[in-house]
Amino acid sequence: MEGLLFNVNNGYIEGIVRGYRNSLLTSTNYTNMTQCESIDDLKLQLGPAYGDFLASLPPKPSTSALAAKTTDKLVSEFRYVRANAAGSLAKFMDYLTYGYMIDNVALLITGTLHERDTRELLERCHPLGWFETMPVLCVATNIEELYNSVMIETPLAPYFKSSLSLQDLDELNIEIVRNTLYKNYLEDFYHFVNTHPDMAGTPTAEVMSELLEFEADRRAINITLNSFGTELSKADRKKLYPNFGQLYPEGTLMLSRADDFEGVRLAVEGVADYKSFFDAAGLGGGPSGPGNMGGGGTEGKSLEDMFYQKEMEISKMAFTRQFTYAIVYAWVKLREQEIRNITWIAECIAQNQKERINNYISVF
């Protein structure tokens, strides 16, 4: 009965998204891409998957232009799915865009603080984080006007009202603002998928809980590691941790008290995956690519490498389930990683860094 009712409203969307998932690049595609000698060769390899979107690129395009066109495909497909979604699935997809909105608003706040023309910043905003009233924010000439506009004109208003004031919006606090908004967003999203009548007790709640708990844990760990050597107090740091996840509450309490990498490692020992990440990365590892991507296995990977790899594995497994909105979230994450992979390979080709070209993450 659950499947019957799901397919009445959402069967078409599920079919479309599974088709998008089947068009993702495979390890064979990546192997062929790493053999390319130029960006134009790479364009040819990407032709079957991205042809229509790459057609307008000039010869010898920049890697940033290539990345923008591959992002355009994700945006186009996402908007098509969203246009055909209805009811709780439409609201679910709106939640997916809030993370991008947070990044866009943080960018506009930073630009306003530096007295930049915020209209120029609109071009740098992520298209999935665009909302109808975003141009209104560009009318603001100072941080107070921007804050008042955000409080009224954006879907993020509830996340601001609950914990941020005008005094928080300064250059030193911008990352704290971003992380506070993300904390409120993740908690709201987690509550939504576990309490909405269409999702509570369904595969959507089960799979999305795993995905969001992983994201909450990753952010808590990264916030802790990035706070070392800064003026952020332990009490303020603790306020940035989402109040759910595999580490919550004991692990996050230990994270809030950690003074060094060893303290973080001890805090995550209760979760086998995270413990193995720290052991393999040697307490943090080093960067290996944009987003700190890494190749196969765990050898030579940074901590963030392994978080990305784990996220891809969870997202891949989401497609083994039926009758769930979670495949939309998983598909977006998988496509984002594909874009990072393409950009990384293109950068290595452009800079003639072939020895590092295999540092990408492929799960298919």
Curated annotation (Swiss-Prot):
It is found in: Vacuole membrane. GO terms for molecular function: proton-transporting ATPase activity, rotational mechanism. GO terms for biological process: vacuolar acidification; vacuolar transport. It is a peripheral membrane protein. Transmembrane segments: none annotated. Its main location: membrane. Pfam families: vATP-synt_AC39. Keywords: Hydrogen ion transport, Ion transport, Membrane, Transport, Vacuole. InterPro entries: ATPase_csu/dsu_sf (IPR036079), ATPase_V0-cplx_csu/dsu (IPR002843), ATPase_V0-cplx_dsu (IPR016727), V-type_ATPase_csu/dsu (IPR035067), V-type_ATPase_csu/dsu_dom_3 (IPR044911). GO terms for cellular component: fungal-type vacuole membrane; vacuolar proton-transporting V-type ATPase complex; vacuolar proton-transporting V-type ATPase, V0 domain. Belongs to the V-ATPase V0D/AC39 subunit family. PANTHER family: VACUOLAR ATP SYNTHASE SUBUNIT AC39 (PTHR11028). V-ATPase is a heteromultimeric enzyme composed of a peripheral catalytic V1 complex (components A to H) attached to an integral membrane V0 proton pore complex (components: a, c, c', c'', d, e, f and VOA1). Subunit of the V0 complex of vacuolar(H+)-ATPase (V-ATPase), a multisubunit enzyme composed of a peripheral complex (V1) that hydrolyzes ATP and a membrane integral complex (V0) that translocates protons. V-ATPase is responsible for acidifying and maintaining the pH of intracellular compartments. This subunit is a non-integral membrane component of the membrane pore domain and is required for proper assembly of the V0 sector. Might be involved in the regulated assembly of V1 subunits onto the membrane sector or alternatively may prevent the passage of protons through V0 pores. This is V-type proton ATPase subunit d.
